[in-house]
Structure formats: C-alpha cells, structure tokens
From Swiss-Prot:
Enzyme type, top EC level: hydrolase
GO molecular function, one term: dCTP deaminase activity
Organism annotation: Methanocorpusculum labreanum (strain ATCC 43576 / DSM 4855 / Z)
Signal peptide annotation: none
Entry keywords, A to Z: Hydrolase, Nucleotide metabolism, Nucleotide-binding
Pathway assigned to this chain's UniProt record: Pyrimidine metabolism; dUMP biosynthesis; dUMP from dCTP: step 1/1
Enzyme Commission numbers on file: 3.5.4.30
Active site per database record: 127 (proton donor/acceptor)
A Pfam short name: DCD
Family recorded in the similarity comment: Belongs to the dCTP deaminase family.
Catalytic activity, reaction form: dCTP + 2 H2O = dUMP + NH4(+) + diphosphate
Lineage summary: Archaea, Methanobacteriati, Methanobacteriota, Stenosarchaea group, Methanomicrobia
Cross-referenced NCBIfam families: dCTP_deam (TIGR02274)
Alphabetical list of SUPFAM superfamilies matching this protein: dUTPase-like
Protein name: dCTP deaminase, dUMP-forming
Length: 187
C-alpha cells in the first residue's frame, strides 16, 4: 500500500518515519518532495578502470566539494546527497523518483539505486546525470526528487540489523562501497 499525503504527514509527526529536517509544505498527494544537499562527488575523466572490488580504484580520480550550487556538465555523472536524513521503520520501504520539472532540464536523479530498504537511516546518495547538451545548475535546498512510501509486512532482518549494511547512517554523497562484498562463485 502506498501512503497518501495525510498518512505521510501523520507517520512523520508521530516519529514512525524520520525526516530531518521536515517541511510539511513538501508533502504531495502520494509522495514527499526531498531537497538537494550541498555535498557533491564526481569522477575526473581518465582511462583508468574502476574495479568495484578494488577500493583504491573507487576513490582515485575523484573530486568533491560542498557548495550552494553545482553545475552538472553535459554527460557528467555526479553523486550528491539529500538535505534530508531519512529513517524508515521495519515495515515501510521507499523509492526515490525524480521530479518532472528537473527531468525536463535533462537531469536524471538516480541511475538504478532508487530503492530504500526498511530499517535504513541516513541521507540518500543521488546518482545524477545530465543528458542535456548544456550544463545545468542545481542548487542546495531545491526540491530535486520525491520519496514514495510503501507499507509492507515487517521484515525479519531490516537494513539496520544487517551486518553488511554498507550505507547505514551515511552522511554526505557516498562513493560505492561495492568493494566490501566478497567475490563468490567467480571463474
């Protein structure tokens, strides 16, 4: 079941869903608008291969900065954070979707990481890309996406109880932590 506006506001007011900071004006009929934070991380162009199992390759040739805005260049991939910290209970999951007005500028909000598990707490790392032929400026604090909340049965092992929860309590835009997975059944 997808939560509607009054349910979203009620769940947040009662502390069942944590949104910090929370602005009631951002509650939409079937979602909650979320805003862009001020931390940005991106890869510099080069020919070095990124190997998801080699931590050092995940972090080389990266730049990061905090700022009130960021100009996303055509074709550029940039990680950004949400302004809001999101905390979910063990029976609510969320998906993040882009805002239509932002998409119409050529900005994709996430590549594939749009699912937020029950039990997650932290800022959400956005995997943004500019498919426009022109640079697009995005501002910290601007509504950039929306969270849709789904009520499920209580899960047996929510994200905050998983021993390998790599992104629990993350703050700032977070580079992939795929290197923390073990190689299994690889020939």
């Amino acid at each position: 079941m997808i939560l509607v506006d009054w349910e979203i506001a009620d769940h947040i007011k009662r502390g069942y869903i944590g949104i910090d900071p929370f602005d009631p004006a951002l509650v939409q009929p079937n979602s909650l608008d979320i805003r862009l934070g001020n931390h940005f991380v991106w890869y510099e162009p080069c020919d070095d291969v990124i190997d998801p199992y080699q931590k050092e390759t995940l972090h080389t040739h990266t730049q990061e900065r905090k700022g009130s805005y960021f100009d996303i260049q055509p074709g550029q991939f940039v990680l950004a954070e949400t302004l809001e910290t999101v905390t979910l209970p063990d029976n609510i999951v969320s998906s993040i979707e882009g805002k239509s007005s932002v998409a119409r500028l050529g900005i994709a909000l996430h590549q594939t990481g749009g699912w937020i598990d029950a039990g997650f707490s932290g800022t959400i790392t956005l995997e943004m890309c500019n498919s426009n032929c022109r640079p697009v400026r995005v501002y910290a604090g601007m509504p950039i996406g929306q969270l849709v909340f789904y009520v499920t049965k209580r899960c047996e092992c929510p994200y905050d109880k998983k021993p390998d929860a790599k992104y629990q309590n993350q703050k700032n835009a977070t580079i992939s932590r795929y290197d923390r997975k073990m190689l299994k059944n690889v020939e």
